[in-house]
Amino acid sequence: MSQEFAHLSVLLAETVGGLNIKDDGIYIDGTFGRGGHSRQILQRLGDNGRLIAIDRDPQAIEAAKQFSDDPRFQIVHGGFGQLADYVEDLGLVGKIDGVLLDLGVSSPQLDDAERGFSFLRDGPLDMRMDNSQGQTAAQWLAHAEIEDMAWVFKTYGEEKNARHIARCIAADRDKTPFLRTKDLADLIARITKNKERNKHPATRVFQAIRIYINSELDQIDQALEGALAVLAPQGRLSIISFHSLEDRIVKRFIRRHSQGESVPYGLPITEDQINKSRKLRAIGKAIMPSDEEIERNARARSSVLRIAERLDY
């Protein structure tokens, strides 16, 4: 594999192990990235197994050529939020034995200054997961209303100074448009008074813009519902989150479908009826990276893995 595609997959053994892979199973890697998880899945699959990988990043699609000679593997260019549509097109609804999602931005995307994801590397202010379509971060910042920017920074970045930062961006962009990551990062650093220890002042705003530009949380919601719809009985969900917004969505989804439908107090309903409304069961507790993994890969520090199984009712 070339250096361009080098990437350390987080919680690799735990995430793939959580799929409980069968020799002849059919699995989905909804976030192919550079193929770390897919490679491990293929190594565990037998000759009759199948892996469907998905990614909306054109560079990831290029990286998937490393598996082009493996008849068990296929890659789909698109967002994982549409995974149920892809599965339906293949006639595999109810036959998927496991879905893996590694949420957020990948290391290659962060490390490539030209992608515009990182405030530590100067490059075009882009931030699109699929840089072949959609508006860039620079285009959005050039026209967004102050209220809209403040809402995005607060909602998706949990930024305390959201309104102040939005006002400053609006005031400065009339003189000089924000076209590069350094332009935005420098402004935020300059206007932020109470800086968090060991955290760049632009961290939360960059996260918020990235999530908004790529509709990341909507994609997660759609992917979870889609996975539930296509999983076979005893099929597994194995999902890595990297910040509280992602993990909260995953945690609540698993909890909601593990508890079953809520019914009004006093409504006559049997235990069997309640059980039949339960669609998932959580497998163990949330898994965090070991100290050893964090030492090898600092970006693993904030990762959380949750595993769930589709119930057979």
Swiss-Prot record:
It catalyses: cytidine(1402) in 16S rRNA + S-adenosyl-L-methionine = N(4)-methylcytidine(1402) in 16S rRNA + S-adenosyl-L-homocysteine + H(+). It holds the Pfam family Methyltransf_5. GO terms for biological process: rRNA base methylation. It is an enzyme of class 2 (transferase). InterPro entries: RsmH (IPR002903), SAM-dep_MeTrfase_MraW_recog (IPR023397), SAM-dependent_MTases_sf (IPR029063). NCBIfam families: 16S rRNA (cytosine(1402)-N(4))-methyltransferase RsmH. Belongs to the methyltransferase superfamily. RsmH family. HAMAP family: 16SrRNA_methyltr_H (MF_01007). Specifically methylates the N4 position of cytidine in position 1402 (C1402) of 16S rRNA. This is Ribosomal RNA small subunit methyltransferase H. The lineage of its organism: Bacteria, Pseudomonadati, Pseudomonadota, Gammaproteobacteria, Alteromonadales.
